[in-house]
Curated annotation (Swiss-Prot):
PANTHER family: CHROMOSOME TRANSMISSION FIDELITY FACTOR 18, DNA LIGASE. This is DNA ligase. Disulfide bonds: none annotated. InterPro entries: BRCT_dom, BRCT_dom_sf, DisA/LigA_HHH, DNA_ligase, DNA_ligase_AS, DNA_ligase_CS, DNAligase_adenylation, DNAligase_N. It comes from the Bacteria. It holds the Pfam family DNA_ligase_aden. GO terms for molecular function: DNA binding; DNA ligase (NAD+) activity; metal ion binding. Its cofactor is Mg(2+); Mn(2+). The active site is at residue 109. It catalyses: NAD(+) + (deoxyribonucleotide)n-3'-hydroxyl + 5'-phospho-(deoxyribonucleotide)m = (deoxyribonucleotide)n+m + AMP + beta-nicotinamide D-nucleotide. Residues 577-652 form the BRCT domain. DNA ligase that catalyzes the formation of phosphodiester linkages between 5'-phosphoryl and 3'-hydroxyl groups in double-stranded DNA using NAD as a coenzyme and as the energy source for the reaction. It is essential for DNA replication and repair of damaged DNA. NAD(+) binds at residues 29-33, 78-79, 107, 130, 164, 278, 302. The gene is ligA.
Length: 652
């Protein structure tokens, strides 16, 4: 059996490398899963023969309490940027002035997250983010779930390597399709999705998403003589190395490589944002050294934002939650930075006037920050008889008169009952940074609003599972899950609720500062203007906005309705030792909670003075157990630790 287990480990690790390196595995997912299950069963039967590099070590159900800071033994430096051939030539002249014989290795600049992996005696000890280059975050448990990161090297060596963790384009599309179906906000791009994944506290989420890596640098002393030799040694150790690179002493050849890569960019299985050029010789790298911020022996050429021409077919005017009316151009479809673009923002009426944008114009389109399609300028020599774009005078949603205030560039609808604003306010209220009602995304809000089941935020808390099942595509399981998420949000600290109300100028930071000062929404509503304005970091604009809002009958009625519905209106983040019921206690959460999310339960416990731990020990004061509680509950019983349920927590 030991031989078969070894064979399965080697096969599964090989298939994982094929998948991530070539995006073309030699076996189907079904065959991989079959072999994986066979290995799992064998490891259950023969636990003494489990290999340290077994792929089963990657998958688990850890829920982390957070990420600890990690100080890098060797700092991660930034690279000097270049945006033109002239800047690359200047870099070449500087290098060749000292070392005429120098050659370069040029490799793809992966658009992901920089990571550092430290191995001790061949075993992965620490995986960390770059952070500020000196201190990052320890995300070892999450990186263990990335299948192409070796958990155990074939040699018992101490080694620290650097690389990029990224999300392949195919995985990105799959994840966004799932989020769309669940009514969740889609990720803007693969890099954001990768970043969000690596900061997940639930490692099961990380294991499910198919993150991948390219390793490209060794930190600290090395026996290799060149960057090329470093990459070759990485491949032998089982790391994924990007095969697309060249070595040349000629900047002409390097520039040709850059141009070739730029043409291939859209066809690659992953996002890149440039090409990194390094002096190949490690001895020359050491001689050239570093500036305060960057190595002198490397430079990163950044691709310019891709631009395409398209015709403006029409312009839509949409209303946001604050009443701002934003113009968006409908375009003839063009391929831009790997996606089909048929719409682009025109920002505001002043921007339209400044650029003299008209229906039928041929315009240059680009992606601002490689994310948001926008119109750069009009191609005037292609203009024919186009007439200036008519600017709306009434709201496209409610037909109320639009206002263009002197101190603003935007048109604004000031009707508080505007349907478009109401829907956007509901979406904002349920969003992650506000009440974080998982599953209540734009698509579900639209259905609920159209069905006249909700009109304002208080209506959300009158919904029942039966109401939710009236919606097309919502079955009992989904309805129950969303209902529980709505109920769980009632326990949020008041700064979340304040931000969710969408009061003009009151962002998440201001909401926290206000709640730290006044401790409840009711106290804030009754507060003096001067007391609000005196808070460091706020001022008279926010004070005026709050006083105006809370003076309205609608706001006063809403507070009463939310309190009646059972929402917490107090700040939970500033309990003192004297009034914190659980001060000094170490509490462990285990199992699935019915009404609270794990983060909400943790937040409530901490607000009551408890220290929330991730594992049970003799120091544990009590364990709160939900359904399907496992080994933590059993250990607590063995140690004689007090056990409570979710109802006890909710009663506090």
């Amino acid at each position: 059996m030991k031989e078969r287990m070894n064979e399965l480990v080697q096969l599964l690790n090989q298939y994982a490398r094929e998948y991530y390196t070539k995006d073309n595995p030699s076996v189907s997912d079904a065959e991989y899963d079959k072999l994986y299950r066979e290995l799992v069963e064998l490891e259950k039967e023969f636990p003494e023969d489990i290999l340290p590099n077994s792929p089963t070590h990657r998958v688990g159900d850890l829920v982390l309490d957070g990420f600890e800071k990690y100080r890098h033994e060797y700092p991660l430096f930034s690279l000097q940027d270049a945006f033109s051939r002239e800047e690359l030539d200047a870099f070449d002249r500087r290098i060749k002035a000292e070392f005429p014989q120098a050659d370069y290795l040029a490799e793809l600049k992966i658009d992901g997250l920089s990571i550092s992996l430290t191995y001790v005696n061949g075993r992965l000890r620490v995986g960390a983010t770059r952070g500020d280059g000196t201190v990052g975050e320890n995300i070892t448990e999450n990186l263990k779930r990335v299948r192409d990161i070796p958990l155990h090297l074939p040699e018992n060596i101490d080694l620290t390597v650097r690389g990029e963790c990224y999300l392949p384009k195919a995985s990105f599309k799959t994840i966004n399709a799932e989020r769309r179906e669940n009514g969740e906000t889609e990720f803007a791009n693969p890099r954001n999705a990768a970043a969000g994944t690596l900061r997940q506290l639930d490692t099961k989420v990380v294991a499910k998403r198919k993150l991948a890596t390219f390793i490209y640098q060794e930190a600290g002393p090395t026996a290799a003589s060149s960057q090329e030799a470093v990459l070759e040694s990485f491949a032998k150790l089982g790391f994924t190395v990007n095969p697309r690179h060249i070595i040349s002493s000629s900047m002409d050849a390097i520039w040709q490589f850059i141009e070739d890569v730029a043409k291939e960019r859209a066809e690659l299985a992953y996002d890149i944002d440039g090409v990194v050029i390094k002096v190949n010789s490690l001895a020359l790298q050491e001689a050239l050294g570093f500036t305060v911020k960057a190595p002198r022996w490397a430079i990163a050429y950044k691709f310019p934002a891709e631009e395409k021409t398209a015709e403006i077919l029409s312009v839509d005017w949409t209303v946001g939650r604050t009443g701002v009316v934003t113009p968006t151009a409908n375009l003839t479809p063009v391929q831009l930075a790997g996606t089909t673009v048929s719409r682009a923002t025109l920002h505001n009426v002043d921007y339209i006037a400044e650029k003299d944008i008209r229906i039928g114009d041929i315009v240059v389109v680009y992606k601002a920050g490689d994310i948001i399609p926008a119109v750069l300028h009009v191609v005037e020599n292609k203009r024919d008889q186009q007439v200036p774009l008519p600017i709306p005078t009434v709201c496209p949603s409610c037909q109320s008169e639009l206002i263009h205030f002197e101190d603003e560039v935007a048109l604004r609808c000031v009707n508080p009952r505007c349907p478009a604003q109401l829907k956007e306010k509901l979406i904002h209220f349920a969003s992650r940074d506000a009440m974080n009602i998982i599953g209540l995304g734009p698509a579900i809000v639209e259905k609920l609003f159209t069905a006249e089941l909700i009109c304002d935020v208080a209506d959300i808390y009158q919904l029942t599972p039966e109401n939710l099942m009236q919606l097309e595509g919502i079955k009992e399981k989904s309805a129950t899950k969303l209902y529980k998420a709505i109920q769980a949000s009632k326990a949020n600290s008041a700064e979340k609720l304040l931000f969710g109300l969408g009061i003009r100028h009151v962002g998440s930071k201001a909401s926290r500062l206000l709640m730290e000062r006044f401790e409840s929404l009711e106290q804030l509503a009754a507060a003096d203007f001067d007391d609000i304005a005196a808070i460091d970091g706020l001022g008279i604009v926010i004070a005026e906005s709050l006083k105006t809002y809370f003076a309205t009958a609608g706001a006063q009625k809403l507070l009463i309705e939310l309190k009646t519905a059972g929402l917490n209106l107090t700040y939970l983040g500033k309990k003192t030792a004297s009034d914190a019921a659980l001060t000094g206690m170490t509490i462990v959460l285990t199992g699935k909670l019915a009404n609270l999310t794990r983060s909400q339960a943790k937040e409530k416990l901490q607000s009551l003075g408890a220290n929330v731990a991730g594992s049970v020990s003799k120091k544990t004061s009590l364990v709160i157990a939900g359904s399907d509680a496992g080994s933590k509950l059993e250990k607590a019983k063995t140690l004689g630790i007090e056990i409570k349920d979710e109802a006890w927590l909710e009663s506090l």
